[in-house]
Amino acid sequence: MTDETNLSGFGSKAVHSGTNHIGDAVNTPIFQSSTYKLTDERYAGWAAGAQHTLLYARLSSVNSDAVAAKLCAMEGGEDAETFSSGMGAISTTLVSLLSNGDHIVASTDVYGGTYGLMTEELPRFGISTTMADMRDPASYEAAIQENTKILYIET
């Protein structure tokens, strides 16, 4: 890995952080592995709750870990998750934050997949959504209920 303590500029962080110099490659090579050897060390890390243990590519990979490290360096974050699609990111975030009985206020012009998630899928789990006009803050305020957990706006 690059010594990220010496990277000060945004561009330098974008290029150099999260880089895994395997085989003297300047940038992290693209790995097409879907599974990784389950060593005792990796298993122990996974069992202890390590978030970025290399076990299976859908959970973590050398490449997704490199992207996450770059995002953290550029944004000053502690950790990051990467997803293969926007809907993967949206649905994972909403499902992890909401429970049966919770409510969302969302903008009327969300992406069609988001609309379907909020109006067809989440109600099956007892999560309701009220649509509001994002151009009118008063409509958001009027839609807030006692059980509202998320105000959702897409741009």
Task: Identify the residue ranges that each predicted region occupies.
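Well-ordered alpha/beta subsegment
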Residues: G76-G77, H103, P137, E141
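Buried hydrophobic positions in well-ordered alpha/beta secondary-structure cores of metabolic enzymes
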Residues: D24, L71, A89, I104, ...
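N-terminal "arm"/small-domain region of PLP-dependent enzymes with the aminotransferase-like
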Residues: T2-S61, A69
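Short helix-loop-beta connector
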Residues: M74-E78, L98-G101, E146-N147
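Conserved PLP-anchoring active-site segment centered on the Schiff-base-forming lysine
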Residues: S96-T114, A132-D133
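Conserved N-terminal alpha-helix of the aminotransferase class I/II PLP-enzyme fold
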Residues: D40-G88, G113-E121
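PLP-dependent aminotransferase-class I/II
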Residues: G116-T155
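Glycine- and other small-residue-rich loops at beta-strand/loop junctions that grip anionic moieties
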Residues: Y56, T82, S107-T108, T129-A132, ...
